[in-house]
């Protein structure tokens, strides 16, 4: 089975109006009980299964269901547990103040392959040829997390833009108009 199902295969209960896939419900068993929530577009992959088993969560797939879609609640729950554990672990025990800041997780897998390739080309990232989208997204996200950012300057510029309803780009176009006149 490849995770896709037909309309006839997906009839595992009464159709729910909110479910995007013909009334499918979440394929997970949470604490011994089947999740009644409507399935979203997130699927229960081997990677998700591995992270669930590593985190010792009480989630399992229902073997009677013919699809692998999970609800948005469980998708967010799994992601939040994964991100919390990542932030808590550090080399120096996590007591330093720089580890207390909440680092947002950017999901670059949502980008198109061409965009990821353009990013790779722009920053001249060294990779082996023929990477698939997941490998390319992982390489790009590793680089993206390590880009130094001057937070003070960025915040000051943002506040300036909000207060003045302008940006530096607007100023450049105005100065070029003045030169033409």
From Swiss-Prot:
Start and end residues of each stretch annotated as Disordered: 82-103
Family note: Belongs to the SAP30 family.
Motif Nuclear localization signal (NLS), residue numbers: 83-88
Function: Functions as a transcription repressor, probably via its interaction with histone deacetylase complexes. Involved in the functional recruitment of the class 1 Sin3-histone deacetylase complex (HDAC) to the nucleolus. Binds DNA, apparently without sequence-specificity, and bends bound double-stranded DNA. Binds phosphoinositol phosphates (phosphoinositol 3-phosphate, phosphoinositol 4-phosphate and phosphoinositol 5-phosphate) via the same basic sequence motif that mediates DNA binding and nuclear import.
Identification of the protein by name: Histone deacetylase complex subunit SAP30L-A
GO MF annotations in UniProt: DNA binding; histone binding; non-sequence-specific DNA binding, bending; nucleosome binding; phosphatidylinositol-3-phosphate binding; phosphatidylinositol-4-phosphate binding; phosphatidylinositol-5-phosphate binding; transcription coregulator activity
Assembly with partners or alone: Interacts with components of the histone deacetylase complex sin3a, hdac1 and hdac2. Binds histones and nucleosomes.
Entry remark concerning the domains of this protein: The zinc-finger domain mediates direct interaction with DNA and phosphoinositol phosphates (phosphoinositol 3-phosphate, phosphoinositol 4-phosphate and phosphoinositol 5-phosphate). In vitro oxydation causes reversible disulfide bond formation between Cys residues in the zinc-finger domain and reversible loss of zinc ion binding.
Zinc finger (Atypical): 26-74
Subcellular localization: Nucleus, Nucleolus
Keyword list, A-Z: Disulfide bond, DNA-binding, Lipid-binding, Metal-binding, Nucleus, Repressor, Transcription, Transcription regulation, Zinc, Zinc-finger
Keyword presence, Repeat: no
């Amino acid at each position: 089975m490849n995770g896709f199902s037909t309309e006839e295969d997906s009839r595992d209960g009464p159709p729910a109006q909110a479910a995007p896939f013909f009334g499918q419900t979440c394929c997970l068993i949470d604490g011994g009980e089947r999740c009644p929530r409507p399935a979203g577009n997130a699927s229960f992959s081997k990677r998700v299964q591995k992270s669930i088993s590593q985190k010792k969560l009480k989630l399992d797939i229902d073997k009677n269901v013919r699809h692998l879609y999970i609800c948005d609640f469980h998708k967010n729950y799994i992601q939040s547990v994964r991100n919390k554990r990542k932030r808590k672990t550090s080399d120096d025990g996590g007591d330093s103040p720089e580890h207390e800041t909440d680092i947002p997780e950017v999901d670059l897998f949502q980008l198109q392959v061409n965009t990821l390739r353009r990013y790779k080309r722009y920053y001249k990232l060294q990779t082996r040829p023929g990477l698939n989208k997941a490998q390319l997204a992982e390489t790009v996200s590793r680089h993206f997390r390590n880009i130094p950012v001057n937070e003070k300057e960025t915040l000051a510029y943002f506040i300036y833009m909000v207060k003045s309803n302008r940006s530096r780009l607007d100023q450049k176009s105005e100065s070029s108009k003045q030169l033409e006149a």
